[in-house]
Design a protein with these regions (language model features):
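Short membrane-interface loop/juxtamembrane segments of multi-pass integral membrane proteins
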Residues: 25-38, 99-109
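Portal/gating segments that form or line small-molecule/metal binding sites
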Residues: 1-34
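Hydrophobic transmembrane alpha-helices
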Residues: 43-148
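Membrane-interface loop-to-helix entry segments
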Residues: 1-4, 40-48
Length: 148
């Protein structure tokens, strides 16, 4: 789950019409394009990355503090995505409606194979670095480092 979260998160920085845009023109241009990469999986890859990260941490550390912190993160990511859709509908109108028609709120796992190799590599490197850094942060080893 955390590898998928890292891939979705990493891919969300390029060509994302949900990011803030003061003048609005660049975002409308992005929303008019055909969805590619992680946006074929979900229109909120960054937020789903946060949600999957939180869910995975609740699964590996089923304690009350983990449920409270990570459960809040999951809730904020998904509720925030829903709220962002409503805000973009109001501010972008038809451009966002077109984007919504070609993307999905819920991840479409069948589209994972459409993610560019570059994004997969960046996500894997990010995941590797984040799992390696657990020990440096004073936590226990995570991911593959638990077994090395």
């Amino acid at each position: 789950l955390t590898l998928l979260a890292a891939i979705l998160f990493s891919g969300s920085f390029r060509g994302n019409p949900a990011l803030p845009d003061p003048d609005g023109d660049g975002i409308r241009t992005l929303a008019a394009k055909v969805a590619t990469g992680v946006f074929r999986v979900t229109r909120h890859p960054m937020m789903w990355g946060f949600a999957l990260w939180g869910l995975s941490h609740m699964l590996v550390a089923p304690r009350m503090d983990s449920f409270l912190f990570n459960g809040s993160l999951v809730f904020l990511a998904l509720a925030g995505s829903y709220g962002q859709d409503r805000k973009k509908e109001a501010t972008m109108g038809d451009a966002w409606a077109k984007w919504e028609r070609q993307t999905s709120f819920w991840p479409r796992l069948s589209q994972l194979g459409k993610i560019e190799p570059r994004t997969l590599l960046i996500g894997a490197v990010f995941w590797f670095a984040a799992t390696w850094a657990h020990n440096l942060a004073g936590s226990y080893e995570a991911g593959i480092f638990r077994w090395l």
